[in-house]
Amino acid sequence: MDTTDLKSRVKDYWEREVCGSRYGARLQQDRKRFFQEIEKTRYEQDYMLRDFARFEEARGKRVLEIGLGAGTDFVQWVRSGSIAYGRDLTVASVDMVKEIGRAHV
């Protein structure tokens, strides 16, 4: 398999399933609860992440997140008062982060 084909397959996979979104899958109809469940599960499973990232220390700082996934960490940067920018390989992930913003989760 050449690298172009592999990259295409990886991108297609993440377009179909945004990283982390399966945590809220059972709540698809209630989008606010969907995003809340993703966040709750993320920080229960990766319980050291908040201490590592130190979101609260980002106030007023510029942050670039590469690989937005379901947007859970990106939202933490925004909530902390940082000037946050994000990039992702997939349109699905970027759209999900925009939806979180519109839902004010």
Sequence positions of predicted segments:
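Alpha-helical packing segments of well-folded alpha/beta enzyme cores
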Residues: 6, 10, 17, 48-51, ...
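N-terminal, positively charged/glycine-rich alpha-helical extensions of SAM-dependent methyltransferases
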Residues: 1-36
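Intrinsically disordered, low-complexity regulatory segments enriched
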Residues: 18-19, 39, 60, 82
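Conserved alpha-helix/loop element of class I SAM-dependent methyltransferases that forms part
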Residues: 29-61
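Short hydrophobic/aromatic-rich motifs at helix boundaries and adjacent loops
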Residues: 23, 35, 44-46, 67-71
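Class I SAM-dependent methyltransferase SAM/SAH-binding core
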Residues: 58-102
